[in-house]
C-alpha cells in the first residue's frame, strides 16, 4: 500500500526505497513499474510538454526530478540526453 501511494504521488525508486526502509519494510526489487514513464508523467504534470529552454530550466527540472527520487540516468533520458550541452553556447 505504501508503495502504490508513493508512486501515485510521483515519487521515484530512490525515494520509495528510502521511505520503505524508514518504515521498516523490506524493499522489493521486483516492482513492475516503468520508472521512465513515471518520471515523464511527473515532469509533464509539473512543467508541461515544452522541453527545457535553457541550462537554468534544464537544471531546475533535473533538481525537481532528483528531489522526487528518480535516478540520474532516468532524469537524463526524460530531459533529453545531452541537452545540457546544447545550452552551453547560451
From Swiss-Prot:
Q: Which Pfam families match?
A: RecX_HTH2, RecX_HTH3
Per the record, its GO cellular-component terms are: cytoplasm
In terms of superkingdom, the source organism counts as Bacteria
| InterPro entries, per database record | RecX_HTH_2nd (IPR053924), RecX_HTH_3rd (IPR053925), WH-like_DNA-bd_sf (IPR036388)
What keywords appear on the UniProt entry?
Answer: Cytoplasm
**Where can this protein be found?**
Cytoplasm
Keyword check for Heme: no
Q: Does the keyword rRNA processing apply?
A: no
Q: Of which family is this protein a member?
A: Belongs to the RecX family.
General function of this protein: Modulates RecA activity.
Spell out the protein name for this chain: Regulatory protein RecX
Source species, please? Acidithiobacillus ferridurans
Q: What is the lineage of its organism?
A: Bacteria, Pseudomonadati, Pseudomonadota, Acidithiobacillia, Acidithiobacillales
Amino acid at each position: 500500500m505504501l508503495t502504490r501511494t508513493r508512486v501515485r504521488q510521483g515519487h521515484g525508486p530512490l525515494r520509495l526505497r528510502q521511505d520503505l526502509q524508514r518504515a521498516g519494510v523490506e524493499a522489493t526489487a521486483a516492482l513492475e513499474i516503468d520508472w521512465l514513464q513515471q518520471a515523464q508523467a511527473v515532469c509533464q504534470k509539473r512543467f508541461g510538454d515544452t522541453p527545457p529552454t535553457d541550462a537554468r530550466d534544464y537544471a531546475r527540472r533535473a533538481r525537481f526530478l532528483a528531489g522526487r527520487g528518480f535516478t540520474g540516468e532516468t532524469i537524463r533520458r526524460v530531459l533529453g540526453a545531452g541537452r545540457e550541452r546544447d545550452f552551453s553556447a547560451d
